[in-house]
Amino acid sequence: MSGEKEEASLRMFGAYGEPEERRDVLESSGVSSQPEPQVQQQLGSLLGVPWQPPGPPIQHSPADQETSTVTQQQWHLQGLGRSELQAAGLPDAQPGEAAESSPSFLLGSEVGQPYSSSSPSEEVLSLLRAIPPIPDEVVVRQKRAPQGSWKVGTLFHGKRVYAVAISGSTHHVYTCGSGYIRVWDESALHAGEKAPRAQLDLQHPQDRVVTCKLFPDERSLITGGASQAVTLWDLAPTPQVRAQLTSTGPTCYSLAVSSDAHICLACFHGFVEIWDLQNQILIRKHEVPVYGSRCVDITGNIFWTGGEDTILYSWDLRSYQRLHQHNLQNEILSITHDPGEEWVLAGLRTSDIVFLHTRRNEQFKALMKKYTRHHSLKFASCGSYFVTAIDTRLSGLEAPSLQKLFQIEESSGILCCDVSSDNQYLVMGSSSSATIYQLLY
């Protein structure tokens, strides 16, 4: 429904699992409540965590239609293993009970019969040798979340670092600011005051990069900012300019690249440029609300914009029609999404984070309760956690439980952040340098 404010049930949670008092979130009418298990389903879908409905829906009277909360225990129990359940004081099967109720799968003449330790026959060995090895890429690996971080080094950029990116394949770091971009190799991450691997000078000395995005293959970088063009860089084998995409606005505030790297969105004051990256041509200059154009993101065939007017807009990338608008009641400073493109996260001026489902009319909010000038968000490629940087503090939060995994306090304000695609390193940009942390598992 174009032009109409979306009415969705908005749930409030204190970050790090701290329960909030029950309250009405939206003052407008029509806000419906959801049973607590449905919220678990919402967050569980971030990682594909299975969720079983408790039974037929319960009809509530109008007096019951209010926003509820979820306790820390209800959230945290979603991913607990056996040892964690025991530590939480929950009942678990005893070893003897497990042995009695579980069938034995040891080889023998009958199920449950003790397995003979005699050597296998040559026929069995030949059959085993004939089984092809399992390709490494099809092995299912556990999506772990880090439990801490360790500071490994500082990269001295020399000027304010407005945007930063780090690759997972080479662990190269790209620090962006006024006049130039500096490229650092992995050896510089662990060495103090090591010179950058390369310096990429911008077209004009007064140009300034304020946003950058690595392509999914990490072989290209696109940058935008106070410049007459959005710049496309080839990173391998030697970093160099591939193309200058001439812009129609003075400053690009935010960039978004589609998952297939075919489309780039560049957000300017009052409009979004939609670029075909393969052919390097401008597809469309799409007008958006002037005060709703600070940041942009893309999920599938939908792109999202937001800014000072507190409204998160969703647009159809094919018809260019406005799909929905969500009044988040506070200025939007950043937008990102989970790797599955199922949830969009909006970072607010109040430091709160709003989660919106990309296909269903569902949303909820994690409360931080602190006004901030900068709010950076980055979802890890594994999908098990994301980081949020507010002023001088960066926190790693587990998904879907929102439990705090680690916290970093910097001496100066954090302007930007990124996580390597292999989930090994975290980089933060500040006044004149970038700080590197290794994630601990």
Curated annotation (Swiss-Prot):
Classification via PANTHER family: TRANSDUCIN-LIKE ENHANCER PROTEIN, TRANSDUCIN-LIKE ENHANCER PROTEIN 7
Keyword Membrane applies: no
Gene3D superfamilies the UniProt entry points to: YVTN repeat-like/Quinoprotein amine dehydrogenase
Family: Belongs to the WD repeat Groucho/TLE family.
SUPFAM superfamilies, per the entry: WD40 repeat-like (SSF50978)
InterPro entries: Groucho_enhance, WD40/YVTN_repeat-like_dom_sf, WD40_repeat_dom_sf, WD40_rpt
Biased composition (Polar residues): 62-76
Protein name: Transducin-like enhancer protein 7
Listed GO CC annotations: nucleus; transcription regulator complex
Entry keyword annotation includes Repeat: yes
Keywords, alphabetical: Repeat, WD repeat
Repeat region (WD), residues: 156-194, 204-243, 247-285, 286-325, 409-441
Pfam family, one: WD40
Molecular functions (GO terms): transcription corepressor activity
GO biological process: negative regulation of canonical Wnt signaling pathway
Ranges of biased composition (kind: Low complexity): 27-49, 108-119
